[in-house]
Curated annotation (Swiss-Prot):
Descriptive protein name: Cytochrome b
Cofactor binding remark: Binds 2 heme b groups non-covalently.
A GO cellular component annotation in the UniProt record: respiratory chain complex III
Cofactors required: heme b
Length: 379
C-alpha cells in the first residue's frame, strides 16, 4: 500500500514542501527565520481578525474603539498588545532573515530574492497603514508626513497625495481606506510567501558554505522540523515576555493621545523598524532626493546579485567582506538610533555620514573587497 502523503493531491504538496524536502545537512540556526516569519504572519492575521471585530474605522470613534478593546473586551488588551508587538517581532525576524541572505549569498537565487524584496515592501506598507488605525497623535501625523512625501513626485505628486487621502487632508476617508488595505494586504503577503517558497524549492536551500550540497541532503522531517520547533519555542518565549511585561517598550507615548490636527507633536517619527530608512530620508536636504534615497535604501537589495565580484558565494571564508558586513549592520543600528533623534546637531551630521556609508559599503566597498579577495586566493 502506498503512503497517503505521497499520493493524495493535497498531502503530496505538503509532503514535498515540509516532510520529504531534501535539505542541506549543514544549515545553521540562521535558516530558522523563514518558518518564524510564517509564524509571525499567522499570529498577526489571527490577532488582527479579532481586533477587526471590535474596531471602527471612523475618525470620531477609532481611538475610543481601541480603548474599548483594551478595557471591555475579554482579553482585548492581550490581543491588542500581541498584534502591536507582533509587528515588531515580524520586522526583527525579517531583518535577520535578510541579513542571513546577504551574509551567505542567498541573493543568487534571483526569483526567490526578488519576491522577498516585494514581500518586504508589502510588509512595510501593511505595518505603516496599521500604525495609522489607532488614530493617536503619532498615527495621524505619521500618516500626514509619510503620505505627503509622494508630493515630491514631479507633475502628478500633489494630485496623487490628494487621491490617496481622499480629500485635502488625512481624514475619515483616509482612515477608512487604510483599514481596508491593512485587512486585505496580509492575505496577499501570505500568497506571495507561497510563491517565495515555490521558487526556493525549485533550487533548494543555500547553505553556510555557499557550495552545492546535492551530495549531502537530509529529509526536512524530522530533522529540520525539530529545529524549527525549538526556534518557535524560543521566539514565543521572547514574544510573550515582551507582550506581558513590557507591552509599551517599543511604542510611542504620543499615540496614547487622540489625534489632533491642530496640535503637532514635537518629534514626528515612525515605529522603530522604519527609523533607519527615515534617517536616510532626513539626511538629504532636498525633498525629492530624500524620497529617492528612502526607496533606494530598500531597493538596493535588488542590485546585490548584479554588483557582486567575489567568486565565493558565502562570506564565511572572506574576512574583508565579513568586516564590511558587520560595519553595515552597525551602520543600520546607528541610522535607527539617529532616526529617533530630533533634527539638530550633532544628530544631523551623524545621520548624513551613516547614510553615505550605507550606500558606499553596499555599492562600492563590498565589490572592491570581492576583487581583493579573489586576488588573494589567486582566482
Amino acid at each position: 500500500m502506498t503512503i497517503m502523503r505521497k499520493t493524495h493531491p493535497l498531502m503530496k504538496m505538503v509532503n514535498h514542501a515540509f516532510i520529504d524536502l531534501p535539505t542541506p545537512a549543514n544549515i545553521s540556526g540562521w535558516w530558522n527565520f523563514g518558518s518564524l516569519l510564517g509564524l509571525c504572519l499567522i499570529i498577526q492575521i489571527a490577532s488582527g481578525l479579532f481586533l477587526a471585530m471590535h474596531y471602527t474605522p471612523d475618525t470620531l470613534t477609532a481611538f475610543s474603539s481601541v480603548t474599548h478593546i483594551c478595557r471591555d473586551v475579554n482579553y482585548g488588551w492581550l490581543i491588542r498588545y500581541m498584534h502591536a508587538n507582533g509587528a515588531s517581532l515580524f520586522f526583527i525576524c525579517l531583518y535577520l532573515h535578510i541579513g542571513r541572505g546577504i551574509y551567505y549569498g542567498s541573493y543568487y537565487y534571483m526569483e526567490t530574492w526578488n519576491i522577498g524584496i516585494i514581500l518586504l515592501f508589502l510588509t512595510m506598507a501593511t505595518a505603516f497603514m496599521g500604525y495609522v488605525l489607532p488614530w493617536g497623535q503619532m498615527s495621524f501625523w505619521g500618516a500626514t508626513v509619510i503620505t505627503n512625501l509622494l508630493s515630491a513626485i514631479p507633475y502628478i505628486g500633489t494630485d496623487l497625495v490628494e487621491w490617496i487621502w481622499g480629500g485635502f487632508s488625512v481624514d475619515k476617508a483616509t482612515l477608512n481606506r487604510f483599514x481596508a488595505f491593512h485587512f486585505x494586504l496580509p492575505f496577499x503577503i501570505a500568497a506571495m510567501a507561497m510563491v517565495h517558497l515555490l521558487f526556493l524549492h525549485e533550487t533548494g536551500s543555500n547553505n553556510p558554505l555557499g557550495i552545492p550540497s546535492d551530495c549531502d541532503k537530509i529529509p526536512f522531517h524530522p530533522y529540520x522540523t525539530t529545529k524549527d520547533f525549538l526556534g518557535i519555542v524560543l521566539l514565543l518565549a521572547f514574544f510573550f515576555t515582551l507582550v506581558l511585561f513590557f507591552p509599551d517598550l517599543l511604542g510611542d507615548p504620543d499615540n496614547y493621545s487622540p489625534a489632533n490636527p491642530l496640535n503637532t507633536p514635537p518629534h514626528i517619527k515612525p515605529e522603530w523598524y522604519f527609523l533607519f530608512a527615515y534617517a536616510i530620508l532626513r539626511s538629504i536636504p532636498n525633498k525629492l532626493g530624500g524620497v529617492i534615497a528612502l526607496v533606494m535604501s530598500i531597493l538596493i537589495l535588488a542590485l546585490l546579485p548584479h554588483i557582486q565580484t567575489a567568486k565565493q558565494r558565502s562570506l564565511m571564508f572572506r574576512p574583508i567582506s565579513q568586516l564590511l558586513f558587520w560595519l553595515l549592520v552597525s551602520d543600520v543600528l546607528i541610522l535607527t538610533w539617529i532616526g529617533g533623534q530630533p533634527v539638530e546637531p550633532p544628530x544631523i551630521i551623524i545621520g548624513q555620514i551613516a547614510s553615505f556609508l550605507y550606500f558606499a559599503i553596499i555599492l562600492v566597498l563590498m565589490p572592491i573587497a570581492g576583487i581583493i579577495e579573489n586576488k588573494m586566493l589567486k582566482w
